[in-house]
A protein has these predicted regions:
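A conserved acidic beta->alpha catalytic loop
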Residues: 51-60, 80, 107
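Conserved donor NDP-sugar-binding/catalytic core segment of glycosyltransferases
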Residues: 116-149
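Glycine-rich, basic loop-to-helix element that forms the pyrophosphate-binding segment
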Residues: 78-99, 120
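Short aromatic/hydrophobic "clamp" motif used to bind/position activated sugar donors
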Residues: 103
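Short, well-formed alpha-helical segments that are part of the catalytic scaffolds
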Residues: 25-38
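Conserved nucleotide-sugar donor-binding catalytic segment
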Residues: 96, 136, 153-232
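Catalytic core of nucleotide-sugar-dependent glycosyltransferases
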Residues: 164, 218-222, 227-255, 277-286
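Acidic helix N-cap motif at the loop->helix transition within catalytic regions
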Residues: 30, 56-65
């Protein structure tokens, strides 16, 4: 059973909607909703909340903000948890409600720290028709407010293309704003996590631009200390996800598939902490033959390791 509430009273269609998925985010939800409601824009926007049968204070907090901001929220309160039943929240409940030109995202445990975030992103997309999406840099924090990393990279603002996504680049969902066509062209046949499909679809339809501005916080939650073994297992799981994702895409040549799978593996080994994890174990976990991939990229790996040895002395 689904209970829907709406505080939308305006007749005009907002220019932007914000997809906000909530499940037991009560400890962090006020940060999220404060960031969403504090946006300074010269256009109307709406917030589409989906609460997946939270058992904590989340529903109460959402209703509190609905009363404070009666023109912003359209909310679905689930009686039974949908995610645990294998139901896709975005494609089943959120995407069918979208009526706006642009779509932004922010889960209930993430939050925005720039009151001009939506305005900056919409201004950019309005003046760059060749771009399908835009995003800013992010800060990564733990369950409290302690920074894990201030920014994911120090690179300057730049354009990303499909080649980048297929090679292992994902865009921070808490910071991205996409054109409606990204949602309209969503491929429901691809069985993968939403972050990958979002990045792939956006990059397939146009350039994706990264602004230098740091406008969002991604909260990395989890209990206990993450050991190096835990981290390796997590990265292996992510590699499996990429492998399965690549297999579902229609590449014109088999070598093209190998090319992108190789790039993702090398990216993880060199840049994401798997260089201390035995390569044979990586292959075993992936359950596929990557001998050619290993031979093809071994020189690059050696150069990378040698460089790391000398630069860390």
């Amino acid at each position: 059973m689904v209970i829907m509430s709406t505080s939308e009273t305006k007749e005009s269609t907002p220019l932007v909607c914000v997809i906000c998925d909530v499940f037991n985010h009560g400890a962090y939800l006020r940060d999220c909703l404060n960031g969403l409601t504090n946006q300074e824009t010269n256009f109307d926007y709406t917030i589409l909340i989906h609460d997946d049968a939270s058992t904590d204070s989340s529903p109460h907090i959402i209703k509190e903000y609905e009363e404070r901001y009666p023109n912003l929220f359209k909310t679905i309160f689930q009686k039974n948890n949908q995610y645990s039943q294998g139901i896709g929240i975005w494609k089943t409940y959120q995407f069918p409600r979208i009526q706006t030109k642009y779509v932004a995202f922010c889960e209930g445990d993430d939050y925005w720290i720039d009151s001009m975030k939506l305005q900056k992103e919409v201004d950019f997309l309005e003046s760059h028709s060749e771009c399908s999406a835009v995003f800013g840099n992010i800060i990564v924090r733990d369950e409290t407010v302690n920074p894990i990393t201030e920014t994911p990279s120090k690179q300057l603002a730049r354009f990303f293309k499909l080649e980048d996504v297929l090679s292992g680049t994902l865009f921070p969902v808490a910071s991205i704003c996409v054109r409606r066509m990204v949602i309209d062209n969503w491929d429901n046949s691809i069985r993968s996590n939403g972050d990958m499909i979002l990045a792939y679809t956006a990059a397939s339809l146009g350039n994706v631009y990264m602004l230098n501005d740091c406008m969002s916080v991604y909260r990395r939650t989890g209990k206990g200390v993450c050991t190096s073994k835990d981290r390796s297992q997590q990265l292996i799981a992510e590699l499996k996800e990429w492998y399965n994702f690549h297999k579902q895409l229609q590449f014109p040549k088999p070598l093209t598939l190998i090319h992108y799978q190789s790039k993702v593996i090398v990216r993880y080994i060199c840049n994401m902490g798997l260089h201390h994890f035995p390569f044979k174990d990586i292959l075993k976990h992936l359950r596929t033959k990557y001998v050619l991939i290993y031979v093809y990229y071994i020189n690059k790996l050696l150069i990378k390791h040698i460089y790391n040895i000398f630069t860390t002395r």
